């Protein structure tokens, strides 16, 4: 096929011209490696944090050009339910979905979620096993303050996580509230007495109402979308390592719009620095 000389020269100049977006494209490719669920807006804000200002339409065009659209795999699965009936005292719902607070370490929430993995036993048979995660989150900035990982629902793991969360929030100048669902572990005398010992209010969601603890449910959803759904884990250690890595990433690097495009730790430290200046 023959082209007019003018057409040939036009495209030759286009191909020879340096790519004006090369730096931006390289930055975006680097970001996609670390932030697998970042869409257009978060990529734009990350670029701005590095001093690169680009409009939204250009970001969308470059995402399509580079083939880095978000492709996280999601799947609905049965939610783990720790409710075993009334095995102790059920606390009243003090939070009432009032999750917002401008006071660090004042409102804390917790819950348990379940993961599945596979291991080959001594006879060579592949067995499905379970792992349980018990985190404590600060409503102030959605930071995960403490967490424990165990192979079965475990009162000791929850009490250890509770103790660590209490110690980390001792600097709060106001009386604290620790929220949860009505799971068996949170009705235990040991759990309730530990809160009373530190003069902490206990709050519980209404029975079977996961929206009463939606910030924690959102964290579980993000965690499973990023590292669990669509993946197969062959050992406890492999899955545990992934959870450890993601929790650090979530706390220190994953920016949130409600935190002025900072990560939970970045937001907390920025506010602290501002109040000390």
What do the predicted segments below correspond to?
Residues 10, 141-147, 202-205, 229-230:
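Short small-residue beta-strand/loop micro-motif enriched in glycine and branched aliphatics
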């Amino acid at each position: 096929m023959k082209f007019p000389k003018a057409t040939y020269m036009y495209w030759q100049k286009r191909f020879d011209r340096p790519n004006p977006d090369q730096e931006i494209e390289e930055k975006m490719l680097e970001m996609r490696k670390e932030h697998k669920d970042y869409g257009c807006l978060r990529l734009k804000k990350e670029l701005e944090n590095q001093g690169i200002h680009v409009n939204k339409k250009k970001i969308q065009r470059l995402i399509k050009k580079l083939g880095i659209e978000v492709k996280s795999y999601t799947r609905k699965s049965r939610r783990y339910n720790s409710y075993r009936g009334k095995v102790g005292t059920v606390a009243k719902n003090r939070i009432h979905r009032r999750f917002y607070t401008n006071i660090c370490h004042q409102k804390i929430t917790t819950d348990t979620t379940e993961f599945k993995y596979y291991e080959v036993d001594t006879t060579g048979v592949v067995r499905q096993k379970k792992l349980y995660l018990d985190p404590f989150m600060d409503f102030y900035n959605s930071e995960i303050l403490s967490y424990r990982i165990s192979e079965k629902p475990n009162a000791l793991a929850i009490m250890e996580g509770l103790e660590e969360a209490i110690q980390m929030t001792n600097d709060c100048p106001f009386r604290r509230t620790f929220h949860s669902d009505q799971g068996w572990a949170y009705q235990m005398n040991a759990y309730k007495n530990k809160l009373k010992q530190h003069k902490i209010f206990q709050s519980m969601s209404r029975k079977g109402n996961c929206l009463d603890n939606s910030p924690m449910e959102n964290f579980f959803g993000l965690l499973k979308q990023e590292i669990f759904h669509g993946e197969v884990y062959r050992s406890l250690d492999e899955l545990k390592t992934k959870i450890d890595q993601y929790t650090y990433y979530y706390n220190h690097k994953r920016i949130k719009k409600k935190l002025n495009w900072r990560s939970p730790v970045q937001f907390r430290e920025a506010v602290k620095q501002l109040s000390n200046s």
